[in-house]
Every structure is written in C-alpha cells, then in structure tokens.
A protein has these predicted regions:
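Short beta-strand/loop motif that positions the catalytic acidic residue
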Residues: 224, 230-232, 236
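Hydrolase active-site cap/lid region
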Residues: 158, 162-205
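The serine-hydrolase catalytic nucleophile loop
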Residues: 75-87
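Alpha/beta-hydrolase active-site loop
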Residues: 81, 116-136
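Alpha/beta-hydrolase fold nucleophile elbow
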Residues: 138-149
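N-terminal cap/lid segment of alpha/beta-hydrolase-fold proteins
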Residues: 31-62
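Catalytic histidine-centered segment of alpha/beta-hydrolase-like enzymes
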Residues: 262-273
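Conserved alpha/beta-hydrolase
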Residues: 88-109
C-alpha cells in the first residue's frame, strides 16, 4: 500500500509537470520563443483555386498551439531551400511551413507552369496557404510570421503590405525588390517581350512582367508597420544591397543587418549567422 509521503511526492511531481506544460503552451500562445528539443515533419497540401500547393510542416513537439511561421522560397527554387531555417526556428516553438510556389521552380511539386507564374500569382499562393492554416489543428490562430528568401522576400513583403493586420513579424533575406527595375528596364513595353523567355533555367511568360509596370514597390510594402528584419550581403551582384537599404528607410520599424562579403544565397557559416540574427529577432 502506498504511503502518504509517496502519494504527496507523486502529486507534487504531477503538479510540477502540469505547470511546466501550461507554461510551455502559454509561451507559445504568446508568440514568445521557447526551447524545443524535438519536432515532427509532415506533408501538407493546400489549394489556390484548382491548383494544388505542396509544402512541409515542421511541428514542435509538446506545444498544443504553436505560432505559425511561413517560409517562401526564391525563383527557380523550392521548399527545400527553407529547410535550414525551419529546422532552427521550429526549436523556438514555431510551427514552420515551407512550400512550393505554383510554377515557382524546376523541381516544384505544386501545380502550375513556370510560364504562368508572377510575383502576384505567388502572393496569391501565399494567401491561400495562410488561409488553409485556419483549419489546421495545433496551430495558433491569428497573425502569422513570414520569412521570405530572394523573390520569396518580395512576395512576403507585398503580402504584408497588402494585409498588415494578418502579419506578426516579417523577415526578408536578400529580398529581390529589384524585380520591377530589372524587367521593366529590359522590356520598356510588354510588347517588347517575347511570349516566353528563358531565365533562371526556366521559361517565364509575359505574365511575369506585365503586372510590374504600375507597381510602386516601396509604397506598397511600407503599408506594413510591424517589425521587419532585413538581411543582405554586401557582395550581392544579383540583387544590389541598395534595394534593401531603401526598404529599411521605407519601413517604420525595421532592423537591417549587412553580411560582409556575402553574395546572393547564404550557405555554411553565413547562413548560420543569418539564422542566429533571425532567432534573436523573433525572440525579442
């Protein structure tokens, strides 16, 4: 028969365990960073109209309602480019979703042709993904944090500017805010552009360019007044750092970190440094 002292010990242990669980859930629900030792991965599909969107959800173990962070990849890439960020940030207690834009890359598992893709079709993909999470169990309802890489940074910035009340925080990693200037300079009129051009190892159509002419990039993205973290290499020859400098000036509440010697595309030590910057930003 169990002694009274043993019963009290077990009861005390149960109370402590319950308190720890409540504290962990409370921290996650408040969008505060917590330390998570393990996580799971699962395939998760959504729809933009009739087009299927593929992605991978990283879930932190032990958190009942995890705040959502969505990673958007660059042109020609796919969800795998977000994996290093997801594997680090899920350990802060975030549910992290990396997905493939429709027509966004050669290895995309989502529907759609690259010749039909534009930054605005990708913004619609992002909106569809965010809407899908309203019905996913284990995800904290409300605002979402966005992390965009290169063209995914442009798309994330546009979405945040168009939907400022839906975004908790915004992280832009060498965001391709040069897209309008690059393409409109090359094709001053849409009729100057062939029906299809080869770029980034894929075929892009007029849909990619025709909606850029009237776009006020900085006027639109600066509608977002929340916290922004911008990270850019000073040796980026694909997207000059001046575009991020201008974004830093346009945003009301941004932090800007220059990565000395880094080009377009972070790897190894530089990528790890960028991840630490992002972690610090999310934890504050």
């Amino acid at each position: 028969m169990m002694s009274i002292s043993n019963k009290r010990s077990i009861f005390s242990w149960m109370v402590l365990a319950l308190a720890s669980t409540v504290m962990l859930a409370s921290c996650a629900s408040a969008n505060k960073a917590v330390s998570v030792d393990s996580f799971s991965k699962e395939d998760l599909w959504s729809f933009n109209g009739e087009k299927k969107i593929y992605g991978v959800l990283y879930r932190p173990d032990g958190i009942k309602k995890a705040p959502l962070l969505i990673v958007s990849h660059g042109i020609g890439s796919d969800h795998r480019s977000g994996a290093p960020y997801a594997e680090a940030l899920v350990k802060l207690g975030y549910a992290v979703y990396c997905y493939d834009f429709c027509g966004g890359g050669r290895a995309s598992r989502s529907d759609g042709k690259t010749s039909e893709m534009s930054i605005f079709s990708e913004e619609a993909d992002l909106a569809a993904v965010i809407d899908m999470f309203k019905n996913v169990e284990g995800i904290k309802k409300g605002k979402v944090t966005l992390l965009g890489i290169s063209q995914g940074g442009m798309v994330s910035a546009l979405y945040a500017g168009d939907n400022p009340k839906k975004v908790e925080k915004l992280v832009l990693v060498y965001p391709a805010l040069c897209i309008k200037d690059d393409w409109v300079t090359k094709y001053p009129k849409i009729t100057d552009m062939p029906e299809v051009v080869n770029s980034f190892g894929m075929q892009l159509g007029r849909a990619y360019v025709e909606s850029l002419y009237d776009l006020d990039v900085y006027g639109r993205i600066s509608n977002y007044k929340g916290e922004v973290q911008i990270i850019h290499g000073d040796q980026d020859h694909l997207v000059p750092i001046s575009y991020s400098e201008k974004a830093h000036e346009a945003y009301k509440n941004s932090s800007f970190k220059v990565m000395p010697g880094a080009g377009h595309g972070f790897r190894g030590k530089v990528q790890q440094e960028a991840i630490e910057i992002i972690k610090d930003f999310l934890m504050r």
